[in-house]
Amino acid sequence: MTNIRKTHPLMKIVNNAFVDLPAPSNISSWWNFGSLLGICLILQILTGLFLAMHYTADTTTAFSSVTHICRDVNYGWIIRYMHANGASMFFICLFMHVGRGLYYGSYAFMETWNIGVILLFATMATAFMGYVLPWGQMSFWGATVITNLLSAIPYIGTNLVEWIWGGFSVDKATLTRFFAFHFIFPFIIAALAMVHLLFLHETGSNNPTGISSDADKIPFHPYYTIKDILGALLLILALMILVLFSPDLLGDPDNYTPANPLNTPPHIKPEWYFLFAYAILRSIPNKLGGVLALVLSILILILMPLLHTSKQRSMMFRPISQCLFWILVADLLTLTWIGGQPVEHPYIIIGQLASIMYFLLILVLMPVASTIENNLLKW
């Protein structure tokens, strides 16, 4: 008799995705982040659900409802901090996952890659709206500043911003709709993630060498299930250390002050995972130019398959490209640091140089380096 997991219509899908899936024998721990992102998403949906049971999306009570969750709800504090820091872990995994894709040439699977870029945008939108919900000072002013950027769009900008706000400023209508969107988006992300996997399983996984692994496959279970469980345990360990020892490490103290439209905080800045993009936005002294650079800083990922000039897929055997990749990582860390600094000398010029370097590396230096490597190998 055939095993039920191979015949049952539902279990057959799960079996082909997580049990009998042929996987390359040499994929490293950099391939763990996909499953970790799935775990992060499930964790965020569950903690978010319990938070939504006690949260009120109203300007008069939002801030105090979050305080109520932390003080009066059984284990409310741990649910709240797991949700807030879970977002940070989510973005750490996202950046690692995208970085892995860039390094090993995973963007050659164009459908998978493009869905991934859409997933990145959707996750960033969700995190932004979630940051507005506690209705602290940074929530309010962050929402005001970021939504205001849309007013830079010619002709329709102002109308668009007022339409998103549901009025002439960030107010009750804005908070209510942001809560509604913040609740629905993770489910859209989950659906997109399934499409992401669907496209991935059409081709199979890439591997560190970038060479076809069809000649050497192993079953996903038990080899990669156990590897994913180890990754998950390490992720949860890191998250719980953050939650239990320094839950406010990555937060902004200004968000413990209730939102006040009459008092602007001295330094308006987003959560740490948006700082690199915020630094690029600020480095251009023109509103529309800044907004375009901000969008392009992430949209540039879609161009990666077109910018790939090397005859090899992976960077594993390309030392010049490796150097440029790690310079890009250092550049992004520099931008993240600059995004959290006030707009004054020398931070302005450092931010501008780092922004130029970011686009220069991706659009010019890396494709040129790949061509040089081809010539060195006489290809």
UniProtKB/Swiss-Prot annotation:
Pfam families recorded: Cytochrom_B_C, Cytochrome_B
Record note on cofactor: Binds 2 heme b groups non-covalently.
Binding residue positions for heme b b566: H97, H196
Coiled-coil regions, chain positions: none
Binding-site residues for heme b b562, renumbered to this chain: H83, H182
Membrane-spanning residues: 33-53, 77-98, 113-133, 178-198, 226-246, 288-308, 320-340, 347-367
Cofactor(s) listed in the protein's UniProt record: heme b
Molecular-function GO terms, alphabetical: metal ion binding; ubiquinol-cytochrome-c reductase activity
Principal cellular location given in the protein's record: mitochondrion
Localization, UniProt: Mitochondrion inner membrane
Membrane topology type: Multi-pass membrane protein
Biological process terms in GO annotation: mitochondrial electron transport, ubiquinol to cytochrome c
A GO-annotated cellular component: respiratory chain complex III
Miscellaneous field: Heme 1 (or BL or b562) is low-potential and absorbs at about 562 nm, and heme 2 (or BH or b566) is high-potential and absorbs at about 566 nm.
Listed PANTHER family: CYTOCHROME B
Quaternary structure note: The cytochrome bc1 complex contains 11 subunits: 3 respiratory subunits (MT-CYB, CYC1 and UQCRFS1), 2 core proteins (UQCRC1 and UQCRC2) and 6 low-molecular weight proteins (UQCRH/QCR6, UQCRB/QCR7, UQCRQ/QCR8, UQCR10/QCR9, UQCR11/QCR10 and a cleavage product of UQCRFS1). This cytochrome bc1 complex then forms a dimer.
The protein, known as: Cytochrome b
Gene label: MT-CYB
